[in-house]
Every structure is written in structure tokens, then in C-alpha cells.
Amino acid sequence: MSAVQPVNPKPFLNSLTGKFVVCKLKWGMEYKGVLVAVDSYMNLQLAHAEEYIDGNSQGNLGEILIRCNNVLYVGGVDGENETSA
């Protein structure tokens, strides 16, 4: 069995800048888009964002800002092309 390795969040988020990510909020919604920027509080700016509720797309939102205290997790999305935003 392999153990989960701890990751320092700031370098991890900075490494995802310019790539497609999925961000799940504490309230159950998910947002997929290109991570444009992360600040020192770990607020997220996404471009080409799409909202998902219960796995169903609710539509395209464009550019959004997600406040840090709402985020449950952030991860890279495999199979998506990198985009300069």
C-alpha cells in the first residue's frame, strides 16, 4: 500500500498556473477552468470556468474569482490542453 505524500500548497498551486484545474467548494459545487493566478491567501482566479453541480454542467461562467475559505480542494485535470490565459 502506498502512502499519500504531503504537498506544500503554495508551490503546488503555482505549478498549476496556466493549466486546467478542478476546484471543489465546501458547498458541493465544482468549477473547472484555467488557473490564471493565486495570491498569498490562496484565492483562485479561473478563466474559461464552467460550473458543475452534482456532476452536471450548469454552464460557462467565463472568468471567476474563488475566495480561499470556500475551497475544499484543487487538483489538475488530466487530458486537458494547457492554455495561456
From Swiss-Prot:
Belongs to the snRNP Sm proteins family. SmF/LSm6 subfamily. GO terms for cellular component: catalytic step 2 spliceosome; cytosol; pICln-Sm protein complex; U1 snRNP. This is Probable small nuclear ribonucleoprotein F. PANTHER family: SMALL NUCLEAR RIBONUCLEOPROTEIN F, SMALL NUCLEAR RIBONUCLEOPROTEIN F SNRNP-F. The gene is snr-5. InterPro entries: Lsm6/sSmF, LSM_dom_sf, Sm, Sm_dom_euk/arc, Sm_F. Pfam families: LSM (PF01423). Keywords: Cytoplasm, mRNA processing, mRNA splicing, Nucleus, Ribonucleoprotein, RNA-binding, Spliceosome. Residues 8-80 form the Sm domain. Plays a role in pre-mRNA splicing as a core component of the spliceosomal U1, U2, U4 and U5 small nuclear ribonucleoproteins (snRNPs), the building blocks of the spliceosome. GO terms for molecular function: RNA binding. GO terms for biological process: mRNA splicing, via spliceosome. It is found in: Nucleus; Cytoplasm, Cytosol. Signal peptide: none annotated.
